[in-house]
């Protein structure tokens, strides 16, 4: 993605965020209205108007997200994040847990690589001690494996 695409994506995301915040706020207002519903014709008409406005806002947000020129079409959101949101959890928790899992995996892989290098060097040393005539071949293998014998 070049800088122009990133700027367009940022603009599209900001616009979608504003629209979504407006929809959420309207639904909160609608929930309060339903809770305090007095049952009059005027209040019924107000709720219907608010509901129609929300449906129209959702329709516009959907059109904006599916616009061929919109960068939002290229956004992929992991299903796990959506599940977190549906469960009422903060999606930042998913991000933090994901990063921690990757960090643990990287540490594990790094430890395995270190252990294998130590095993390689130990084997090379023992082979060199037992079979001195194989030292050049062992050194060649270590060099081809892009390793070094650190003591």
Swiss-Prot record:
Name used for this protein in its record: Mediator of RNA polymerase II transcription subunit 10
GO terms of biological process kind: negative regulation of transcription by RNA polymerase II; positive regulation of transcription elongation by RNA polymerase II; positive regulation of transcription initiation by RNA polymerase II; RNA polymerase II preinitiation complex assembly
Extent of the signal sequence: none
Family: Belongs to the Mediator complex subunit 10 family.
Cellular component per GO, a single term: core mediator complex
Organism annotation: Eremothecium gossypii (strain ATCC 10895 / CBS 109.51 / FGSC 9923 / NRRL Y-1056) (Yeast)
Biological role stated in the UniProt entry: Component of the Mediator complex, a coactivator involved in the regulated transcription of nearly all RNA polymerase II-dependent genes. Mediator functions as a bridge to convey information from gene-specific regulatory proteins to the basal RNA polymerase II transcription machinery. Mediator is recruited to promoters by direct interactions with regulatory proteins and serves as a scaffold for the assembly of a functional preinitiation complex with RNA polymerase II and the general transcription factors.
Lineage: Eukaryota, Fungi, Dikarya, Ascomycota, Saccharomycotina
Localization (cell): Nucleus
Stretches assigned to coiled coil: none
Keywords, comma-separated and alphabetical: Activator, Nucleus, Transcription, Transcription regulation
Domain of life assignment: Eukaryota
Keyword Transcription regulation: yes
Complexes and interactors: Component of the Mediator complex.
A single GO molecular function term of this UniProt record: transcription coregulator activity
């Amino acid at each position: 993605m070049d800088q122009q695409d990133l700027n367009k994506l940022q603009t599209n995301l900001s616009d979608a965020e504003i629209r979504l915040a407006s929809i959420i706020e309207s639904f909160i207002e609608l929930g309060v209205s339903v809770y305090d519903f007095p049952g009059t014709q005027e209040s019924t008409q107000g709720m219907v108007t608010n509901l129609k406005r929300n449906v129209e806002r959702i329709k516009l947000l959907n059109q904006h997200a599916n616009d061929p020129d919109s960068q939002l079409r290229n956004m992929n959101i992991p299903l796990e994040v959506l599940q977190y949101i549906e469960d009422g959890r903060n999606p930042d928790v998913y991000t933090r847990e994901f990063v921690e899992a990757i960090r643990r995996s990287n540490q594990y892989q790094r430890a395995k690589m270190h252990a294998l290098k130590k095993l390689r060097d130990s084997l090379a040393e023992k082979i060199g001690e037992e079979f001195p005539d194989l030292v050049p071949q062992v050194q060649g293998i270590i060099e081809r494996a892009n390793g070094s014998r650190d003591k």
